[in-house]
């Protein structure tokens, strides 16, 4: 089976644990997107933080003369293309658009949110239950992770799993 090298947290906790404004905002997001706990939210905040850091660094490097500037432009196009493929940025986006992203842009691309928005479940909590119980498939493959990031090309391929009893009945 093998030994895992190192387990690292995929999130960072807030620096001030009892900031009232942050706690209220986080609670609203947890309720709106049906998250199980705030660690799920912090994970997506960390992903956003990484993309914003990359965008800031690339904006600084693009201004450099010579080959460094050209390499930075190519890296910028790669990052923008990746976020576009995920469905977070539009086709003609720039690095400034990455800096304007919010954590809600990433939370909207979760499978749980997509199942609810497409009407396969009545509530966001029911969408999570359908996914964890194995009733939802993406491109014909069963996905049991509510935090699965749905790309633009897979967005139209979300459906009930073919062997699921829910596929044979009308849920909504």
UniProtKB/Swiss-Prot annotation:
- Keyword Zinc-finger belongs to the record: no
Span of domain S4 RNA-binding: 109-165
Subunit architecture: Part of the 30S ribosomal subunit. Contacts protein S5. The interaction surface between S4 and S5 is involved in control of translational fidelity.
Task: Note the Pfam families from the entry.
Answer: Ribosomal_S4 (PF00163), S4 (PF01479)
Q: Which HAMAP family match?
A: Ribosomal_uS4_A (MF_01306_A)
Work out whether the entry's keyword set contains rRNA-binding: yes
Q: What is this protein called?
A: Small ribosomal subunit protein uS4
Q: Keywords in UniProt for this one?
A: Ribonucleoprotein, Ribosomal protein, RNA-binding, rRNA-binding
What functional role does this protein have? One of the primary rRNA binding proteins, it binds directly to 16S rRNA where it nucleates assembly of the body of the 30S subunit. With S5 and S12 plays an important role in translational accuracy.
Source organism: Archaeoglobus fulgidus (strain ATCC 49558 / DSM 4304 / JCM 9628 / NBRC 100126 / VC-16)
Gene Ontology cellular component?
A: small ribosomal subunit
What NCBIfam families does the annotation carry?
A: PRK04051.1, uS4_arch
State a single Gene Ontology molecular function.
structural constituent of ribosome
- Identify its protein family: Belongs to the universal ribosomal protein uS4 family.
- Which GO terms fall under biological process for this protein? ribosomal small subunit biogenesis; translation
């Amino acid at each position: 089976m093998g030994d895992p090298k190192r387990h690292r947290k995929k999130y960072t906790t807030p620096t001030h644990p009892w900031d009232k404004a942050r706690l209220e905002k986080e609670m609203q997001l947890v309720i709106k997107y049906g998250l199980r706990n705030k660690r799920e939210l912090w994970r997506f905040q960390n992903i956003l933080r990484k993309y914003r850091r990359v965008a800031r660094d690339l904006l600084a490097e693009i201004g450099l003369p010579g080959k460094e500037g050209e390499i930075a432009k190519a890296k910028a196009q790669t990052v923008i293309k990746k976020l576009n493929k995920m469905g977070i940025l539009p086709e003609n986006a720039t690095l400034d658009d990455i800096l304007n992203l919010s954590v809600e842009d990433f939370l909207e691309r979760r499978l749980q949110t997509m199942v609810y928005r497409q009407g396969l479940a009545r509530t966001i909590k029911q969408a999570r239950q359908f996914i964890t119980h194995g009733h939802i498939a993406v491109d014909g493959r069963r996905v049991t992770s509510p935090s699965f990031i749905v790309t633009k090309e897979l967005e139209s391929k979300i459906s009930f799993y073919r062997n699921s009893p829910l596929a044979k009945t009308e849920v909504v």
